[in-house]
Amino acid sequence: MTQNECFQIAKLALFNVKLLNELENIGHEELKNLIKDVHEKLSIEQQPALINQSTYLQFAYVTLVWLWESINIKDKDDFFIKLKARAHKRELAFPDAHQISGERVISDWKMLVSLLRNALSQGNVEIINEAFIFSDQKKFGKRKEIVPTTLNISATELANISETVFWTINEIIVPTSK
């Protein structure tokens, strides 16, 4: 697949998130009945909201792992400069120090994206209510870590970080984008 084809797949994931959010906000009776029917067919314990933890996790994985690997960003330093600028423009705050624990210092977007990507790709994500705890631990090599480094963020923060990475990737692929 080309970079643009990969990006279009990730764009569909973003479309799904935005569409589900809009549908959930509409709240028509027919839609509620449809959700209830699917819920019962799948035997899910509690009826989920259209936008739920899996929605955010799926979009994060598609963007931060699959799309990232598919397009192979050549100049990562330039990417992270653009990501920081886009985050600032979107008024996306970097996670506070109290949200991060462990041996590793996570002080910039490059380190943050690395932690998220590693945790997502290795399945080291814990979900507690509306929050995600991402864990990453270097167990091999010269910089082996005794304890994992964790990041505790809300679903909204994860969505905003993922979308900011998404649009920054778009800017790399199509330089005249948003």
Feature annotation, model-predicted:
Residues 1-141, 148-178:
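Amphipathic alpha-helical interface elements
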